[in-house]
Structures are given as structure tokens and as C-alpha cells.
């Protein structure tokens, strides 16, 4: 449940004419209720965190870690949700966690995009869902199969992410 920086030190990347040092932060996110593993036969699974000296419920640790990543460590958010085609959990089970993280990113003013993970990202119904989410959240939503992702897809995700930063200054040098 403790967020991890990937890689531990920033990697230099180039997207078109823009060069940046980036690190991604991998965190659990908000728990999807139909998921397994956050409870055991005794009730909520307890985990140790860097924030408390005693174990706390996994769901609470996941929420605290995600909030800290959003508020204290991130510059931009990449929200990953799904159409439900990637496993045994239907789309409807993801919506509450999806809305929670998007509301939090919006409230703190962090730029973000949404990846719609799908085993069939090019199908019309997947594209229609992406359009619906784009309309609802007012941010770019990219249908993608994360399992089949290529280097070019990552480039496109980073490029789309950069467009979410507000322009604060334009400088023109004229001879």
C-alpha cells in the first residue's frame, strides 16, 4: 500500500520537442469493492504503512496513500479505469473508485487524463464509452489495451498528458 516511485530516480524522456525528467508513482488507488484481497476470514486485512506505527485496514491505507500521491507527490495524474473486459469484475464495480479519484484530482487542480483499459479498445462500444466518459469528466479519455501496449502508445499517453497543462506564458522572440 505504500506508493513506489518507478524508477527510483527520474528518467529523461523526449516527447517531440519537449524533454523532461519523469518518475511515475505506482499506488493502489481506491479499492474496487468486488476485488479480492482487501479482506480475509477475520474481516478487513490489516497492513503496515509509513504513516502509522500500528497496522490499519488495507482500504484505509490505500486511500491515504492515493491521497498523498495526488496532493503531495504528483504533477499530473493518469487515471486507469476499465470497461470491464479485462477480468472478472464488471465495469459497474469500478465507477465509484473512478469517480472518487477524478473528483479528488479535479478538486486539487491537478491536470490528468483517463486511460480506459479494454481487451478490445477499437470496438465502437469501447469508443462510445470513452466518448461518454470524456463528456462526463471533461478530460481526454484514451481507450487502450494496457496488456498489448507498445512504446508508441506510451508516447501518445505522455503527449496527451502534456496538453493538459495550462499555458502560463508564451514568449516570442522576433529578429
PLM regions and their residue ranges:
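Canonical P-loop GTPase G-domain recognition
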Residues: 100-113, 118-175
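Switch- and interface-adjacent substructures of P-loop NTPase systems
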Residues: 1-110, 147
Amino acid at each position: 500500500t505504500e506508493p513506489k516511485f518507478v524508477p527510483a530516480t527520474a528518467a529523461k524522456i523526449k516527447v517531440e520537442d519537449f524533454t523532461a525528467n519523469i518518475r511515475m508513482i505506482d499506488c493502489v488507488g481506491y479499492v474496487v469493492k468486488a476485488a479480492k484481497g482487501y479482506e480475509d476470514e477475520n474481516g478487513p486485512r490489516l497492513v503496515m504503512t509509513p504513516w502509522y506505527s500500528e497496522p490499519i485496514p488495507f482500504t484505509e491505507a490505500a486511500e491515504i496513500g492515493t491521497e498523498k500521491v495526488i496532493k503531495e507527490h504528483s504533477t499530473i495524474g493518469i487515471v486507469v479505469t476499465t470497461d470491464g473486459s479485462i477480468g472478472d469484475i464488471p465495469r459497474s464495480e469500478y465507477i465509484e473508485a473512478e469517480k472518487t479519484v477524478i473528483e479528488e484530482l479535479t478538486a486539487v487542480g491537478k491536470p490528468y487524463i483517463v486511460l480506459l483499459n479494454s481487451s478490445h479498445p477499437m470496438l465502437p462500444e469501447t469508443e462510445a464509452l470513452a466518448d461518454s466518459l470524456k463528456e462526463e469528466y471533461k478530460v481526454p479519455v484514451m481507450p487502450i489495451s494496457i496488456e498489448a501496449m507498445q512504446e508508441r502508445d506510451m508516447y501518445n499517453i505522455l503527449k496527451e498528458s502534456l496538453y493538459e497543462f495550462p499555458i502560463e506564458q508564451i514568449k516570442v522572440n522576433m529578429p
